[in-house]
């Protein structure tokens, strides 16, 4: 069976990796490499403190967090490094300390279903200083040891390399034929659309309409002369988070800009 995957972000690259394990499946990936959300995402994995009422959303986010554990194990079995995934814990900051107690109880109630949450604790500034020196702007915060973050560009690069799939770096146009699906003159038995915000444009030519819109995200990177590899992710109240990586790199963001369309201008 010949399968095309359009889009090589987190969804497309993961699909390519697992499909490549099927001996009877030939996988081709199309990705023009512009405006990929995975590369611009903060990559924080910590869904357990969400107070959204949408139970379907929470279930998806929770199972997504759990899935990384499975993915890391599968890649390790194949002898592939998983540097893209770092489980260093997460700090949550709130302006009102009573909100920390609420979130602590919420996470505690969810831990039986989601043991990945790990250790939970409300920490003082002095306790935090032992793990994240010079972090300011709070008296107490909530800590969960199971929090993690993913470096999106490295994730997709790792998965595509592990899959061995052929990657065609061009924008794909999809059409339906009597033999299946056609992309750039090639026929495919199945197609996986992993195009994110471009899904509406992709399906419009086939007569479908979907309620999908773009959201612009921007990160700012800083380079510090510190060993930040084990620093937890910091999630203050608001949109901007602090995401430490290895070798002194710290990212801040990401923005969530709903009215910018596909504008990729850095500002």
Residue ranges of predicted features:
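A conserved short coil-to-beta-strand element within the FAD-binding core of flavoproteins
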Residues: 148, 167-182
């Amino acid at each position: 069976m010949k399968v095309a995957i359009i889009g090589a972000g987190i969804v497309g690259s993961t699909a390519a990796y697992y499909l490549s394990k099927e001996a009877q499946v030939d996988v081709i990936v199309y990705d023009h490499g512009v405006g990929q959300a995975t590369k611009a995402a903060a990559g924080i994995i910590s869904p357990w403190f969400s107070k959204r009422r949408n139970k379907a959303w929470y279930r998806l986010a929770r199972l997504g967090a759990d899935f990384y554990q499975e993915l890391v194990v599968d890649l390790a079995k194949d002898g592939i490094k998983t540097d893209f995934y770092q489980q260093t814990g997460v700090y949550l900051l709130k302006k009102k300390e009573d909100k920390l107690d609420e979130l602590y109880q919420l996470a505690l109630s969810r831990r039986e279903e989601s043991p990945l949450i790990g250790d939970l604790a409300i920490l003082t500034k002095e306790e935090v200083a032992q793990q994240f020196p010079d972090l300011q702007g709070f008296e107490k915060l909530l800590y969960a040891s199971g929090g993690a973050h993913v470096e999106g560009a490295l994730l997709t690069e790792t998965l595509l390399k592990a899959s061995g799939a052929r990657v065609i770096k061009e924008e794909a146009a999809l059409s339906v034929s009597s033999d299946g699906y056609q992309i750039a003159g090639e026929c495919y038995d199945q197609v996986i659309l992993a195009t994110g915000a471009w899904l509406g444009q992709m399906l419009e030519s086939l007569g479908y309409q979907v309620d999908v819109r773009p959201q612009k995200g921007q990160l700012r990177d800083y380079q510090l002369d510190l060993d930040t590899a084990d620093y937890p992710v910091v999630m203050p109240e608001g949109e901007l988070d602090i995401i430490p990586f290895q070798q002194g790199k710290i990212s801040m963001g990401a923005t969530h800009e709903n009215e910018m369309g596909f504008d990729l201008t850095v500002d």
